[in-house]
A protein has these predicted regions:
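The feature marks the mature, well-folded catalytic cores of soluble enzymes
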Residues: 1-302
């Protein structure tokens, strides 16, 4: 099941509500072909289900633990009290199934972590160590908390790669995604004149040093960066890494850049050969500095 938290006139989407609703309707129609859908309505501050939704763990017997972490508007940048109450509400209403686990003493957004399902958590230093999240906890303390709550063996920290226009302090789901067969898909940049070039190059070099738990290098697949997109003179954090994996398909954000959209979809399709690759125009979504994966949260069938 996939959760979408719906935009409305009391959110920041108000000036472009018709435009974003059209995009959400397209996402809804596409996802419903493959999975059940949970639509969450008011009250909510915003619509980024990836960050305020439960983070789910599934055990070997198929049981689920629904981890309810604190969401504080990406380090107290925005109001989040209503979003932070959504998980308890949908759990009490019976819309999600599993064991409720209260983790509200720790700030963690779903978009800030990636897991390989085998014990490794990937995250970014600039996000999890950012002010107004879990300070005064030190990096080592945060790492131990992640390993404990997420039943992980280790945490790999990425120290580079912040996208211009990103107000999450560098969520990993805009930069690096985990795929089958020890594959990491990551955003690259070949234009030395691009302001993101140096940082993304450093990220690429760091990824080359990472090893699996068996000591082998990861298979790295470089996704293109979309050409810069601006709104009111400010660059928006468009990225192809923010794709959504669902049963039978991968939904890929596109930006009306046919050559790069097609290249990204081809590369993602090669990594997920057993799934349909479907493009979703996300030019509306990035006007609020997120994309496809950010809008959604998955839950297992229990």
């Amino acid at each position: 099941m996939v959760q979408l938290t719906w935009p409305h006139a009391k959110t920041d989407w108000a000036p472009m509500l018709d435009e974003i609703t059209e995009t959400y309707n397209e996402m809804t129609a596409t996802i419903r072909k493959y999975e059940d859908l949970l639509i969450v309505g008011e009250p909510n501050n915003d619509t980024w289900a990836r960050d305020h939704g439960f983070i789910t763990l599934v055990d070997d017997q198929g049981g689920a633990k629904l981890l309810d972490f604190c969401f504080n508007g990406w380090g107290e940048k925005f109001e989040a009290d209503l979003d932070n109450a959504i998980n308890r509400r949908i759990y009490d209403e019976g819309k999600v199934k599993g064991e409720y686990v209260d983790c509200l003493d720790f700030v963690l957004e779903g978009g800030s972590i990636e897991s390989d399902g085998e014990g490794t958590i990937f995250t970014t230093s600039c996000c999890l160590l950012a002010p107004h999240r879990n300070q005064p906890m030190a990096k080592a303390e945060i790492e131990e908390r992640l390993k404990r709550d997420l039943c992980a063996k280790r945490v790999l920290w990425i120290d580079y790669g912040h996208l211009v226009g990103d107000d999450t302090d560098g969520h990993i789901d805009t930069l690096v995604r985990v795929a089958p067969n020890y594959t990491l898909l990551y955003i690259g940049c070949d234009d030395e004149a691009d302001e993101q070039y140096d940082d993304l190059k450093k990220m690429e070099e760091q990824l080359k040093t990472f090893r699996t738990l068996d000591g082998e290098p990861y298979k790295l697949v470089k996704l293109p960066s979309p050409r810069p997109i601006y709104e009111d003179g400010e660059r928006l954090p468009a990225t192809y890494a923010n794709f959504l994996i669902i049963n039978g398909a991968v939904l890929v954000p596109t930006y009306n850049q046919p050559d790069l959209d097609a290249e990204a979809m081809k590369l993602i399709g090669e990594v997920f050969p057993d799934r349909n690759i479907i493009g979703i125009d996300c030019r509306s979504v990035i006007k609020q500095h997120g994309s496809l994966h950010c809008c959604t949260m998955q839950y297992p069938r229990i």
